[in-house]
């Protein structure tokens, strides 16, 4: 692992250690930090709680990470993410944004990319779309509303259909 990737991983693990056990466990298991990623259901079954309760615990932990990391070297990841998002009109798919941050900061690809995803979710200036079928998860600034994104998507589909440059998929 490169020095930058190791530094990020170590800083992230230090921040995780300041969370309560259940928050830390849920986040580690969700992102696959130690083993494979686990679903909300798998984690919920372990604790005897619902998927929704696991999601709530994860959200609380991520918000705490956001507060804690303001004084850590990990802030540069959020700063890079905000800068890149600004250059791309305030909205970008999660995968493209994470890849752009990796390139911008010069992180080796052997870092668990979901660490960057969690750090972006912890950024109070960014919002993450809810996972939906047939769409990519994306990050955006608060002023870029879901309604605006859907309107642009709808208009782009119309233009592409008119040009015959779209492949229809059956639902």
Which residue ranges define each predicted feature?
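C-terminal non-catalytic scaffold/interaction domains in large multidomain proteins
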Residues: 1-171
């Amino acid at each position: 692992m490169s020095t930058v990737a190791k530094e990020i991983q170590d800083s992230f693990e230090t921040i995780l250690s300041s969370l309560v056990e259940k928050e830390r466990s849920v986040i580690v298991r969700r992102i696959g930090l130690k083993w494979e990623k686990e679903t909300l259901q798998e984690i919920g079954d372990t604790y005897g709680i619902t998927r929704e309760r696991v999601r709530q615990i994860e959200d609380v932990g991520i918000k705490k990470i956001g507060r804690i990391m303001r004084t850590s070297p990990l802030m540069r990841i959020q700063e890079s993410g905000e800068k890149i998002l600004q250059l791309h009109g305030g909205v970008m798919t999660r995968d493209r944004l994470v890849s752009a941050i990796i390139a911008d900061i010069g992180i080796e690809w052997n870092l668990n990319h979901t660490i960057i995803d969690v750090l972006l979710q912890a950024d109070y200036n960014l919002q993450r779309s809810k996972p939906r079928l047939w769409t990519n998860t994306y990050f955006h600034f608060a002023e870029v509303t879901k309604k605006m994104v859907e309107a642009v998507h709808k208009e782009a589909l119309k233009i592409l259909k008119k040009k015959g440059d779209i492949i229809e998929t059956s639902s």
